[in-house]
C-alpha cells in the first residue's frame, strides 16, 4: 500500500492517477472534501491532518511507501506562522510516523521555494544549500 499526502493538490492528484494506472493500491489523506478526479474512486481516502499525529498513525497502517506532497505555499506575512507549522511540524510528523511504522520508502516532494531567494542569474542545481 502506498500513502500519499497532498493528494488533493495538483502534484498529489497527478501522482495518484499515475500510481493507480500502474495498478498500485493507494491510500490518501484529505482534510475536508474528497476530491474528484480520474481514478479518485479507486483511492482509500482517510480524513486527517498532518498536524494530527493520530490520523497519520492510522493512515500508515499496512503502508510500505509514503509520498509526502503536502505543503502550504504562502507569500503573505500573515500566513507565515501557519505555513511554517504545516510545512515543518507536519513534515516532522510524517517522518516520525514513517519511522514508527518502518516505512520502506519516503519520497518528499518540495519546490524551488525551499531554496529561498537566489542571486539573479545564479545557477540552480542539486549542490545548492537550502
Regions found by a protein language model. Name each.
Residues 34, 71-75, 111-114:
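Active-site proximal helix/loop that lines the substrate pocket
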Residues 25, 81, 86-130:
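Conserved Rossmann-fold NAD(P)-dependent oxidoreductase catalytic core, especially the SDR/UDP-sugar
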Residues 43-86, 97:
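NAD(P)H-binding glycine-rich loop region in Rossmannoid oxidoreductase-like domains
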Residues 29-34, 50:
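N-terminal Rossmann-fold cofactor-binding loop
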Residues 2-24:
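N-terminal Rossmann NAD(P)H-binding glycine-rich loop of SDR-like oxidoreductase domains
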Residues 34-41:
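Short loop/helix-cap segments at secondary-structure boundaries that form the rim of catalytic
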Residues 5, 29, 66-70, 106-112:
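SDR active-site strand-loop-helix element
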Residues 13-15, 38, 77-78, 117-120:
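Short glycine-/acidic-enriched loop or helix-start segments at secondary-structure transitions
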Amino acid at each position: 500500500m502506498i500513502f500519499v499526502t497532498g493528494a488533493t493538490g495538483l502534484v498529489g492528484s497527478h501522482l495518484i492517477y499515475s500510481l493507480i494506472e500502474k495498478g498500485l493500491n493507494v491510500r490518501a489523506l484529505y482534510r475536508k472534501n474528497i476530491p474528484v478526479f480520474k481514478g479518485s474512486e479507486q483511492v482509500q481516502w482517510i480524513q486527517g491532518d498532518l498536524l494530527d499525529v493520530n490520523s497519520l498513525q492510522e493512515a500508515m497502517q499496512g503502508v510500505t511507501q509514503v509520498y509526502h506532497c503536502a505543503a502550504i505555499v504562502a507569500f503573505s506575512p500573515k500566513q507565515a506562522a501557519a505555513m511554517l507549522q504545516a510545512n515543518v511540524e507536519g513534515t516532522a510528523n510524517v517522518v516520525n510516523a514513517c519511522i514508527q511504522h518502518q516505512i520502506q520508502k519516503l519520497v518528499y516532494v518540495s519546490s524551488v521555494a525551499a531554496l529561498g531567494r537566489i542571486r539573479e542569474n545564479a545557477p540552480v542545481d542539486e549542490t545548492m544549500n537550502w
